[in-house]
């Protein structure tokens, strides 16, 4: 998976280009077996949450919408990646 320099403004368009590419591949389910499709979907979701943690603020984020609807608990929510060690 491609790495992004989140300090650059161009990273936002890079994210969108990557998301479009991933969605194109995911929409062609015949080309992938189930395991590869699920792995790619997982990567897409992880990248989307990483994007949101850096660029989306307020109640417009997918994480906030899922929490409001009771589909995501606080313990499931993605924490910002800046300064975090895994």
Swiss-Prot record:
Pfam families listed in its UniProt record: Phage_C (PF12025)
InterPro entries reported for this sequence: C-protein (IPR016407)
Alphabetized UniProt keyword annotations: Host-virus interaction
Highest taxon of the lineage: Viruses
One Gene Ontology term from the biological process aspect of the record: viral DNA genome packaging
Family listed: Belongs to the microviridae C protein family.
Biological role stated in the UniProt entry: Plays a central role in the packaging of viral DNA into phage procapsid, which occurs in the late stage of infection. The protein C can interact with the replicative complex composed of the protein A, the host rep and the viral DNA after the completion of one round of DNA synthesis. When protein C is bound to the replicative form, the complex becomes accessible to procapsid and serves as a DNA packaging apparatus.
The protein's name: Protein C
